[in-house]
């Protein structure tokens, strides 16, 4: 299944707020229309909905998300928490959380077009996994800096998660540590996502 490129408002009406996909939020009372079915069908619908929220928020294909679930499942810690950490440490998401792009798709374009450096080297792979002490910058030219300038200026410093630091004058971000669960930027029940995939095998 390919990455979703359709109407974004349609998705948030069905799944709720997806800040990584769009800044728009569903109108009160218009989102998450609940259909109460009995037994297994209702449980399946809830698990599927959580999985879809995760996929569309981070802008992943079904195959990509499944691969992350498999990697997380091999860890000795909670599969759900490891899954969220893997997704949050993607370069495109780090740029979004730093406030250098308004959405994850926007951050992905910055990476694809070679505007972003990690530790002084150009990285053009949005799924690049960042690690503590990584330094994220734009290329040292007016065009690259101009692409992130307005986003950084309008971002709310209070929303910056504790594992990241941003230098707004130098257009430079720092990964301080692995993300804590409480700073995940999406309201999600990751255990239901893990359950969804465990029941598919």
UniProtKB/Swiss-Prot annotation:
InterPro entries tied to this protein: Ribosomal_uS4, Ribosomal_uS4_bac-type, Ribosomal_uS4_CS, Ribosomal_uS4_N, S4_RNA-bd, S4_RNA-bd_sf
SUPFAM superfamilies, per the entry: Alpha-L RNA-binding motif
Q: Name one GO molecular function term.
A: rRNA binding
**One cellular-component annotation, GO:** small ribosomal subunit
The Gene Ontology biological process annotation of the record reads: ribosomal small subunit biogenesis; translation
Positions of the S4 RNA-binding domain: 89-157
Instruction: Extract the Pfam families matched here.
Output: Ribosomal_S4 (PF00163), S4 (PF01479)
Kindly give the Gene3D superfamilies that the UniProt entry links to this protein.
Ribosomal Protein S4 Delta 41, Chain A, domain 1 (1.10.1050.10), RNA-binding S4 domain (3.10.290.10)
Q: Which key words are in the record? A: Chloroplast, Plastid, Ribonucleoprotein, Ribosomal protein, RNA-binding, rRNA-binding
Tell me where it mainly resides. Answer: plastid
The places in or outside the cell where this protein is found are: Plastid, Chloroplast
- Function as written in the Swiss-Prot or TrEMBL entry: One of the primary rRNA binding proteins, it binds directly to 16S rRNA where it nucleates assembly of the body of the 30S subunit.
Q: PANTHER family attached here?
A: 30S 40S RIBOSOMAL PROTEIN, SMALL RIBOSOMAL SUBUNIT PROTEIN US4M
Subunit composition and interactions: Part of the 30S ribosomal subunit. Contacts protein S5. The interaction surface between S4 and S5 is involved in control of translational fidelity.
What family name appears in the similarity comment?
Belongs to the universal ribosomal protein uS4 family.
The protein's name: Small ribosomal subunit protein uS4c
């Amino acid at each position: 299944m390919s990455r979703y490129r359709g109407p974004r408002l349609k998705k948030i009406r069905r799944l709720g707020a997806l800040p990584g996909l769009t800044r728009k939020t569903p109108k009160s009372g218009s989102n998450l229309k609940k259909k109460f079915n009995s037994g297994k069908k209702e449980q399946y619908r809830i698990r599927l909905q959580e999985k879809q929220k995760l996929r569309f928020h981070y802008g992943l294909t079904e195959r990509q998300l499944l691969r992350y679930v498999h990697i997380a499942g091999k860890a000795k810690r909670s599969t759900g928490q490891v899954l969220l950490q893997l997704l949050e440490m993607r370069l495109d998401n780090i740029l979004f959380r730093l406030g250098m792009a308004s959405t994850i798709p926007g951050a992905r374009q910055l990476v694809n077009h070679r505007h972003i450096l990690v530790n002084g080297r150009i990285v053009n792979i949005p799924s690049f996994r960042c690690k503590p002490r990584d330094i994220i910058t734009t290329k040292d030219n007016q065009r690259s800096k101009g692409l992130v300038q307005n986003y950084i200026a309008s971002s709310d410093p209070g929303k910056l998660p504790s594992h990241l630091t941003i230098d707004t004058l130098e257009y430079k971000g720092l990964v301080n540590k692995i993300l804590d669960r409480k700073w995940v930027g999406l309201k999600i029940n990751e255990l239901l996502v893990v359950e969804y995939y465990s029941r598919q095998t």
